[in-house]
Amino acid sequence: NHTAGILMKWYRDNLGLAEVQQAQQQGERPFEQIAKTASPGPSPLLVLPHFNGSGTPTCDIHSKGAILGMTMSTTRYDIAKGFMDAVAFELRNNLETMRKAGIDIKNLLCVGGGARSPIDLQLKADVTGIPVSTLKVREAACLGASMLAGTGIGAYAGAREAVSCVKTDTTYTPDEKMHMRYNDKYSCYNGLYDILKDINHKQKSW
């Protein structure tokens, strides 16, 4: 979902100021401080992370974000974990869409800011049920550009040979018990967009 980073930035700026201060004091990234506040396992909340419309596979600019299940005992930490869970659920939804098209993804390579968070990487593995790996070269865009350039000048016989430059670093494997817990939550999440679609589209004129 294209709101993944933006969603956590929204949380950081509106609800995570304490974690920002702690991160500054400890020399950490604010996101990692926020991730540390989350309890293991699914959040008690169900979040539709379409705070800026939805990305694939629905691609609906009129879809809106939603947080369901809040009570008087809900904490901002529950919301943070709900956001993280929802982004991972969107990833799983995309993977399942690709599988329906005959593309079976057996492992994931993560790059960018999200690839720097062990907590988030393990979460993605637990939710999707497949291994998630980081790369030895952190600047993946630069690596990809150099691979294409090398292919263009004949340094590689083709793109398949150039891919040999990609080396994995750390791999996060799914926790089966945690995966089963997320399966139950995902089954509820999977119908959330359709349930809220009509309401969200009516809000266009509000």
Task: State where each predicted segment sits.
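Active-site core segments that coordinate phosphate-bearing ligands/cofactors
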Residues: 1-111, 116-206
